Regions:
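Alpha-helical transmembrane bundles and membrane-interface segments of multipass inner-membrane proteins
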Residues: 1-195
Length: 195
């Protein structure tokens, strides 16, 4: 008998709960909160991989999981970017591009499903996900290191270089997100044709 604690659906729901906790913890001031926030995000990201692994290995794939897993993934990633907007790290426009792409692609998939069609994921989309995770991870590392510097020992050059690196990560994530969304639309636009 499989343990309920290893249920993919349980892990998916735990990811949603962890995301809510992540939001409040990251918005609090202090090194300990930034460190815990980063740890929670990486733990939530791990559950994303682990629930898929368990579902396939133990043949526990369910309709609930198919619906909620991508929703939990998007909730985690969009929440992270929104938190960074609140912290003044990510521009609002960058967040809107990422948010808009995810909402539009989700709408396309639901619309297609309603018509009895299944729109499969593209490799471009996987690259988009990698760029977003790398971007969020980099920002989390930066915020943890900055919050640990209670003596303000970072030089202006160090801060400037970190900011340039973070800006580059954001730019790549936005371009990959926008590009994957455009690619997905043109490769699946037939779903909008009237029959």
């Amino acid at each position: 008998m499989k343990s309920v604690f290893l249920s993919p659906n349980t892990l998916t729901m735990s990811r949603i709960i962890l995301t809510v906790i992540f939001i409040f913890v990251m918005l609090a001031d202090g090194f300990i909160f930034k460190f815990l926030g980063a740890a929670i995000f990486f733990l939530a990201s791990f559950t994303d991989w682990y629930d898929g692994y368990i579902a396939k290995k133990h043949k526990m794939v369910s309709d609930f999981g198919k619906l909620m897993d991508p929703i939990a993934d998007k909730f985690l990633m969009l929440s992270a970017f929104l938190v960074f907007v609140k912290m003044g790290i990510v521009p609002v426009l960058a967040f809107l591009v990422i948010f808009g792409r995810e909402v539009f692609i989700t709408f396309m998939r639901l619309y297609a499903k309603n018509k009895g069609q299944i729109l499969s994921a593209e490799k471009f989309g996987k690259y988009k996900t990698v760029s977003q995770v790398f971007c969020v991870g980099s920002i989390l590392i930066y915020t943890v290191l900055r919050s640990a510097d209670t003596t303000n020992s970072w030089s202006d050059v160090t801060i400037s270089r970190w900011q340039e690196y973070i800006d580059f990560c954001i730019m790549v994530a936005v371009l990959m997100t926008l590009g994957s969304g455009i690619s997905y639309y043109f490769n699946n636009k037939n779903v909008f044709r009237l029959q």
